[in-house]
Amino acid sequence: MNSAEQTVTWLITLGVLESPKKTISDPEVFLQASLKDGVVLCRLLERLLPGTIEKVYPEPRNESECLSNIREFLRACGASLRLETFDANDLYQGQNFNKVLSSLVTLNKVTADIGLGSDSVCARPSSHRIKSFDSLGSQSSHSRTSKLLQSQYRSLDMTDNTNSQLVVRAKFNFQQTNEDELSFSKGDVIHVTRVEEGGWWEGTHNGRTGWFPSNYVREIKPSEKPVSPKSGTLKSPPKGFDTTAINKSYYNVVLQNILETEHEYSKELQSVLSTYLRPLQTSDKLSSANTSYLMGNLEEISSFQQVLVQSLEECTKSPEAQQRVGGCFLSLMPQMRTLYLAYCANHPSAVSVLTEHSEDLGEFMETKGASSPGILVLTTGLSKPFMRLDKYPTLLKELERHMEDYHPDRQDIQKSMTAFKNLSAQCQEVRKRKELELQILTEPIRSWEGDDIKTLGSVTYMSQVTIQCAGSEEKNERYLLLFPNLLLMLSASPRMSGFIYQGKLPTTGMTITKLEDSENHRNAFEISGSMIERILVSCTSQQDLHEWVEHLQKQTKVTSVSNPTIKPHSVPSHTLPSHPLTPSSKHADSKPVALTPAYHTLPHPSHHGTPHTTISWGPLEPPKTPKPWSLSCLRPAPPLRPSAALCYKEDLSKSPKTMKKLLPKRKPERKPSDEEFAVRKSTAALEEDAQILKVIEAYCTSAKTRQTLNSTWQGTDLMHNHVLADDDQSSLDSLGRRSSLSRLEPSDLSEDSEYDSIWTAHSYRMGSASRSRKESAPQVLLPEEEKIIVEETKSNGQTVIEEKSLVDTVYALKDEVQELRQDNKKMKKSLEEEQRARKDLEKLVRKVLKNMNDPAWDETNL
């Protein structure tokens, strides 16, 4: 190995020169190009003698800056080591490079002889300098470091004169970054197939062949014998030689990096709080609630990070063999877990505030000195905790990589890595769950009944589970939300456009039983009770199961204390007990009917005060609160408007998206503008309304016939399904059951079939109601309830005949006319643009033809 090769290896070993991944044909040319700007030279001297370089240009842009770096290196060498150096212009211009090379070889020898490159190699001019190589103080450093460095660059030329293949063992883990590289773990055995100078070898491991860094491995031999390199100048180190010095130096470098980045992260948190969030808290830009969402528990996290920095500093003051970095992290892990999980749970609400008030917050941030756009600075600042949390496993992995095998802190470092990985994954899960929870609380829920969901209180816990009712083998995906007094069940619509209400379970009298894993279920628990039919709930993970069991058991104890006595007639209407099915109150006094439904039934207080009278409903379906019967009870569910259906199909034609994108925010109801209001007030609009009224009156004249026909259909269908109705009320109740069953399982139906089932249930209700009207009330016609048959063509070309209310049909037609007018305006505008473009093209063509016909035009004009 010649002097150029030795110098390249020396610089790479010290970490001041990047190792080339390809074979170097001429080491001298490579070295000359690497040293030309003087950055490597300054980095080398700063590594050997920290603090000797006063000024350096890390990225020189011109000749003067390059020469300045070289002269700074020469000045420091002359002042500190009194070496015979070279001329700066010679190195920059590529002249007399032998003199430059000779100076570097001399520098290598001098620093090795005086013991530099060991204690001083990784020392930094920092107030947090770490003690290193304490165990080396009893040994002489004379010529030892030279042999240490030689043992490193000896690996670059480890060919043997014998025909036996070179076998090496990995000292560190290596992960490939290119396709032609070879990945391996610490301790793996690699068969070397090609040895090249420059720091990279080719080898085979587990059937794969690729390139790997030679300083990541060591040779496996029965006895260490002198190697015969090409130059014949370097020998293998003696048997008792210590090969851990450089690993120790890297360990201290990584530890120093952890400490410095921890300082920087703590300062960034304090800056965000003092510069932006605290002034925002005292201003009137946002309400106090929104400001608290933005703040979260960032104050507590900032205080905790300062404590963590102090603990790490105390740890680094100890000798290396007594440092307990992993133990420091493990001792603070419970507090860190609590703080970061709370921050993750609040972050979706903070993002919602950022989105809603982005303009105001952006202006406020820019007034406080933030760069434009100011909202981006705040968003990045609030994301700092997640970014830092993701870096801990990587930093600790690097620290463990350069740690001695028998270091007492190795086991704690490995435990800390696992703990941080679990915490990071748990934080991501909490963020996703809270985003979904916020979406459920802010968007409309289909088929919702009762008070608004916000009146139920705060959500204690929620997740996606699989439920199975007693006596049924069918499993359904559900979203469970636990509120202070009840458990809410939702399902996602078939097209993932929103959520569908499925029912509520009161926590009063609820019993939670954790089940052992079996072939049929894993991570499952059972919900039961005197008023509740058994429900089997399967969770996605063991952690999710633990959370549900803990929260539900705690919740049931709280509700039991607050409600010591439970009476059947005082049960809320939105409950799911399991009672025998009784068709009417008439059977309650006689022998009970042995009917055990495979789904949950809902208690309904009897009109006569009998607590035993129950009315069956569909699985997990809410009952309707008892109200005085009126004609408005016959109103159907809102029909699917054609314009909304078309938009819905357009969304389905796009590529799949994430759950968040598949559940978009509901489009707000269209409000009439001032222009529309004025039109409605006009005489023409009044005449149009008069015409609509005439059409309604014409259809009302045939209402009696249609209702009689619906009654006939209803009776036939009831007989077909063996449903008996003794009076008007039981008839309506049985129809309610059919209505619930018709929309029971949205996961098995399309959106169109779901709405068809709603219209079918409406027809049953209309038929039964018409019979009641004949017997007890005079004929009353409501325009909103009159139906017409509409023939509609779907997007797939299929023609469907639907029944819609007259008023909804008229307004749908009005919307379609409005859309046609807008399309007509767009087409007219496009036509005008096309005409203008054609005229411009015609002028251009005429001009070109005129020039071509001009006799003065010839090839000389080209």
From Swiss-Prot:
Keywords: Cell junction, Cell projection, Coiled coil, Cytoplasm, Guanine-nucleotide releasing factor, Neurogenesis, Phosphoprotein, SH3 domain. It is found in: Cell junction, Focal adhesion; Cell projection, Ruffle; Cytoplasm, Cell cortex; Cell projection, Lamellipodium. Residues 804-854 form a coiled coil. Its main location: other. Residues 250-430 form the DH domain. It holds the Pfam family CH. One of its GO terms (biological process) is positive regulation of growth hormone secretion. GO terms for cellular component: cell cortex; centrosome; cytosol; focal adhesion; lamellipodium; mitotic spindle pole; plasma membrane; postsynapse. InterPro entries: BetaPIX_SH3, CH_dom, CH_dom_sf, DBL_dom_sf, DH_dom, GDS_CDC24_CS, GEF6/7_CC, PH-like_dom_sf. Residues 559-591, 657-679, 728-748 are annotated as: Disordered. Residues 731-744 have a biased composition (Low complexity). This is Rho guanine nucleotide exchange factor 7. It comes from Mus musculus (Mouse). The lineage of its organism: Eukaryota, Metazoa, Chordata, Craniata, Vertebrata.
